[in-house]
C-alpha cells in the first residue's frame, strides 16, 4: 500500500499495539480458548503488517495458514484439556469403526486399480506446458502459485497428508484418554459404594 508517511506511521503503531497486547493476553490468560483466540488476533495483526509492507502473498498466507491453524488449536485445546465430567459412551462405536474401515479399504482398492491405468503422458505434457504458462504470469503471487502446483506439487500434497495424519492421531489420543478417565471414575465410584456397606 502506498500511503502518506503520517498515516503509515499511525497504522504501524496500531498494528504493533495489537501484536503486543495480543501476545500479552496469550501468555497471561488462564483460559486456553481465550489464549488461542488472542493468538489468532496476533497472527491477523502480523498479516496486516505484511500487507502494509506490500507483501500481499505473505499476508494472505499468514491469514490462511496461521489463523486457520489457530482455529484447529482451539478445537484441540477444548478437546484435549477441557474434559467434561459425565460422558455417556456410544455403545455402537464398533459400527462406525467398521464403516470407516470399509470406506478406506474400498478407496485403497479403487486407487490401486486406477493408478496403473492412468495415462501419465498427460501429466508429462502438463510439465512441458509450464514454460508457456509462466510466460503469461505477471505477478509474484501467480508465479508462486504456478510453482506450488507444478514443481512442488508432491511436497505440497505430502505435507497435507502429514497434517491429516497428525489431526487423526490427536483425535485418537484424546478419545482414548477420555475412555480411560471414565473407566477410572467408574472404578472409584464402585469402591465408594462398597465402602458404604
UniProtKB/Swiss-Prot annotation:
Reactions catalysed, as given in the entry: a plastoquinone + NADH + (n+1) H(+)(in) = a plastoquinol + NAD(+) + n H(+)(out); a plastoquinone + NADPH + (n+1) H(+)(in) = a plastoquinol + NADP(+) + n H(+)(out)
GO cellular component: chloroplast thylakoid membrane
Enzyme superclass (EC): translocase
Recorded topology in the membrane: Multi-pass membrane protein
Regions that span the bilayer: 10-30, 32-52, 61-81, 95-115, 153-173
UniProtKB keywords: Chloroplast, Membrane, NAD, NADP, Plastid, Plastoquinone, Quinone, Thylakoid, Translocase, Transmembrane, Transmembrane helix, Transport
Position of the signal peptide: none
EC number(s) stated in the UniProt entry for this protein: 7.1.1.-
Record GO terms (molecular function): NADH dehydrogenase (ubiquinone) activity; quinone binding
Cellular localization per UniProt: Plastid, Chloroplast thylakoid membrane
Main localization category: plastid
Annotated Gene3D superfamilies: NADH-ubiquinone/plastoquinone oxidoreductase chain 6, subunit NuoJ (1.20.120.1200)
Complex and partners: NDH is composed of at least 16 different subunits, 5 of which are encoded in the nucleus.
Family: Belongs to the complex I subunit 6 family.
Its job: NDH shuttles electrons from NAD(P)H:plastoquinone, via FMN and iron-sulfur (Fe-S) centers, to quinones in the photosynthetic chain and possibly in a chloroplast respiratory chain. The immediate electron acceptor for the enzyme in this species is believed to be plastoquinone. Couples the redox reaction to proton translocation, and thus conserves the redox energy in a proton gradient.
Annotated protein name in UniProt: NAD(P)H-quinone oxidoreductase subunit 6, chloroplastic
Organism: Angiopteris evecta (Mule's foot fern)
Higher taxonomy: Eukaryota, Viridiplantae, Streptophyta, Embryophyta, Tracheophyta
